[in-house]
């Protein structure tokens, strides 16, 4: 089975050496994705706004893979400050409330101090149809 690499155009992917997503068969693995606007390489200060942008970035990668947020089966949330997590819930509920993937929230440092959340997902194409 061959794998297909998906890029968002983020400079991080090129500089570090990874793909935004990797597709193998009907499985899509989306890398940890932050709230950067990859076109401008800017990021909002607010964790809720970052969460919304994370989800938009993930949705774009999934679409390139032929999947959608409805196909997400596993999600991981990484936040430097666990106290920020409740502020993300409205955006997360809007994206995953009906999907209800398996989920984990971790508190850990991120690569840039401006990053307040990173989201990683796994999806199975067509599973949410």
Where do the PLM segments sit?
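N-terminal presequence-like segments and the immediate start of the first folded domain
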Residues: 1-56, 60-74, 79-129
């Amino acid at each position: 089975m061959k794998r297909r690499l998906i890029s968002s155009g983020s400079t991080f992917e090129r500089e570090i050496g990874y793909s935004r997503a990797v597709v193998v068969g009907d499985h899509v693995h989306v890398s940890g994705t932050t709230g950067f606007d990859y076109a401008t390489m800017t990021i909002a200060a607010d964790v809720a706004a970052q969460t919304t942008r994370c989800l938009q970035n993930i949705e774009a990668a999934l679409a390139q893979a032929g999947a959608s947020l409805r196909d997400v089966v596993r999600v991981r949330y990484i936040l430097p400050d666990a106290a920020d997590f409740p502020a993300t819930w409205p955006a997360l509920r809007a994206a995953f409330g009906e999907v209800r993937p398996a989920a984990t929230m971790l508190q850990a440092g991120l690569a840039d101090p401006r990053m307040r959340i990173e989201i990683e997902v796994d999806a199975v194409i067509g599973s949410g149809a």
